[in-house]
């Protein structure tokens, strides 16, 4: 029982980490788009991102 429970937790942990990685990628894409859009009006935003 314990071994099966541990393997279930491992699978859950892997799925969670994959989900976090995916959401992190999506967030960085959104941030990049916002940064590039705000660069036309805000020079300091560009210097912060680089």
From Swiss-Prot:
The amidation of Ser-49 is produced by the oxidative cleavage of Ser-50 rather than of a glycine, as in eukaryotes. Keywords: Amidation, Antibiotic, Antimicrobial, Hydroxylation, Thioether bond. There is a cross-link at residues 43-44 (Thiazole-4-carboxylic acid (Glu-Cys)). There is a cross-link at residues 38-47 (3-hydroxypyridine-2,5-dicarboxylic acid (Ser-Ser) (with C-46)). The modification 4-hydroxyglutamate is found at residue 43. The modification 2,3-didehydroalanine (Ser) is found at residue 49. There is a cross-link at residues 43-45 (2-(cystein-S-ylcarbonyl)-3-methyl-4-(glutam-5-yloxy)methylindole (Glu-Cys)). One of its GO terms (biological process) is negative regulation of translational elongation. There is a cross-link at residues 45-46 (Thiazole-4-carboxylic acid (Cys-Cys)). It comes from the Bacteria. The keyword Transferase does not apply. There is a cross-link at residues 38-46 (3-hydroxypyridine-2,5-dicarboxylic acid (Ser-Cys) (with S-47)). The mature peptide is identical to multhiomycin from S.antibioticus strain 8446CC1 (PMID 681244). Used as an antibiotic growth promotant in poultry and pig farming in parts of Asia. Belongs to the thiocillin family. Inhibits bacterial protein biosynthesis by binding to ribosomes. Specifically, binds to the complex of 23S rRNA and ribosomal protein L11 (RPLK) in the 50S ribosomal subunit. While allowing a weak binding of elongation factor G (EF-G) to the ribosome and subsequent GTP-hydrolysis, probably impairs conformational changes in both the ribosome and EF-G which are necessary for translocation. This is Nosiheptide precursor. It comes from Streptomyces actuosus. The gene is nosM.
